């Protein structure tokens, strides 16, 4: 798992070990800001009530065992949020630029294997996002923010020919979903 340490005591960083470069979280904040600005200037979607929704990667079981392949984050989600944990979602409010990270709600028993379970505030600081909630609250949080339109990924990678995984979550059917706008803009 990558470390997110503080660079000179001031800023969190993404790092894959002591002998690798430290990437400041401000890079990912800037990526998010540029994406929001690009969507707002290059498309005709309304800014008010529109949110970009990205789904992070999930763990993949190793055949029929109770272990998983080493986890690798979904590329677009990594580019926006630099999150190392599986099963997360991210949202960006086109009107305000607010970044929201949704983390899985883990049962207390996980601490037996995983060690101390981090709080939402821990994740907010670690990943330099504006707000954090649990993944079982996505629809409720978006409703509270008067979300009308969700921009989701849907497109084919021009190099691999593989299809991007479109975000889905419980309650997504309560919102209008546009899966055409985001992919060409995030790829630029």
Predicted regions and their residues:
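A composition/biophysics-driven feature that prefers long, compositionally simple stretches
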Residues: 1-188
């Amino acid at each position: 798992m990558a470390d997110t340490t503080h660079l000179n005591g001031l800023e969190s960083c993404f790092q894959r070990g002591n002998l690798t470069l430290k990437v400041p979280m401000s890079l990912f904040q800037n990526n998010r800001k540029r994406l929001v600005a690009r969507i707002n200037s290059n498309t005709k979607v309304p800014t008010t009530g529109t949110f970009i929704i990205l789904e992070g990667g999930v763990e993949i079981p190793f055949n029929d065992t109770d272990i998983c392949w080493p986890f690798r984050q979904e590329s677009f989600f990594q580019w926006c949020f630099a999150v190392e944990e599986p099963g997360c979602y991210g949202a960006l409010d086109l009107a305000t630029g607010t970044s929201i990270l949704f983390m899985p709600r883990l049962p207390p028993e996980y601490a037996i294997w995983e060690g101390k379970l981090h709080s939402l505030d821990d994740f907010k600081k670690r990943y330099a996002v504006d707000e954090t909630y649990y993944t079982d609250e996505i629809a409720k949080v978006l409703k509270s923010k008067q979300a009308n339109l969700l921009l989701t990924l849907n497109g084919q990678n021009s190099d691999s020919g593989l299809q991007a995984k479109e975000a889905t979550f419980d309650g997504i059917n309560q919102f209008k979903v546009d899966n055409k706008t985001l992919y060409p803009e995030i790829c630029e």
